[in-house]
């Protein structure tokens, strides 16, 4: 009895779903659908950039007589053309020296290393940030292992204390 009821309900469910699909197919043809085109990738806006002595400038134009409102800290106003009439762009200070060492971001806390051909005395006395000065490291002395000596001393101390305790017990 249960199997007949189950098969009948399955057949009714299948019949109803196919009937609804036929009705929805007719309705969808009369229903208007809006076409949405695929989104186009936005073209990035490229700011004008000049050429600083050590690389590209910041994309900020500036006035050489008043560079401070436009140019951020650690940069200066520079005529990126061959003549001084302009255009003027802000150049990071890292672009003027150590161009090979210049980091990707202009406001990076980076100090170029001390020149290798300077003598050690000049490296030590130069007004250069301490992070950049590499002092020759002295060879470290090997540490004495006091553990072995202490173990020997402890063993002697332990044996003598045990011996003295045994002597007292004998008395």
Curated annotation (Swiss-Prot):
Disordered as annotated region, ranges: 139-171
Superkingdom of origin: Eukaryota
Feature: compositional bias, Polar residues: 158-171
Protein's GO biological process: endoplasmic reticulum unfolded protein response
InterPro entries: DUF5346 (IPR035231)
Protein name per the record: Uncharacterized protein D2096.6
Native organism: Caenorhabditis elegans
